[in-house]
A protein has these predicted regions:
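Catalytic loop of the DD-peptidase/beta-lactamase superfamily, centered on the K-T-G motif
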Residues: 1-172
């Protein structure tokens, strides 16, 4: 957060890895209160957190609700080998599904630098938690499986807002 008051020749820069909270904004506002009032005039953190919760809270709650209850009779996943492989997307590049510690792992980015464990939900539907800033927000990863019982595509929900989150299996 960068807050400047040129008329008073003062400003503050707050660097924080605190999203989605209002901590950086609260620090800046409290700083200006201290400079101009000599004391904090209100609980800025509570006010900013309420604002951030109103912006991001509904999305987190909706995602949690979508995945909080397993189907009454969930179908088991196929063998990991049905899903493991390289997948390509013209917009996002490559996604690699591999096996790690007995579970499936999604790797994205150059050289697979971002890894996300996939938890099973139902048959070919899995859950990941791709947002470091919002670790409690689940997101779906759904495989499209052909008659050969092998995935030919995977849709990554958090990349699919504009319908561009489906990756096709790359030829080996």
């Amino acid at each position: 957060v960068v807050s400047l008051l040129p008329s008073h020749q003062i400003g503050i820069v707050v660097l924080a890895n605190a999203f989605p909270t209002g901590a950086p904004e609260a620090i800046a506002d409290t700083f200006f209160d201290l400079v101009f009032q000599g004391k904090p005039t209100r609980d800025w953190l509570t006010d900013w957190n309420k604002l951030y919760d109103s912006l991001f809270g509904p999305a987190i709650k909706a995602a949690k609700k979508r995945y909080e209850t397993l189907p009454v009779t969930p179908s088991p996943a196929l063998a990991h080998s049905a899903y493991i492989g390289n997948y390509a997307n013209d917009y996002f590049g490559e996604a690699v599904i591999g096996e790690e510690n007995g579970g499936l792992m999604l790797k994205l980015g150059p050289h697979g630098q971002k890894s996300f464990a996939l938890g099973h939900f139902d048959r070919d539907n899995f859950i990941s938690h791709p947002f470091d800033e919002m670790p409690n927000m689940p997101s779906g990863v759904t495989f499209q499986v052909g008659p050969d019982q092998k995935a030919h595509a995977v849709t990554i929900e958090n990349l699919n807002d504009l319908g561009m989150g489906t990756f096709s299996r790359a030829s080996n």
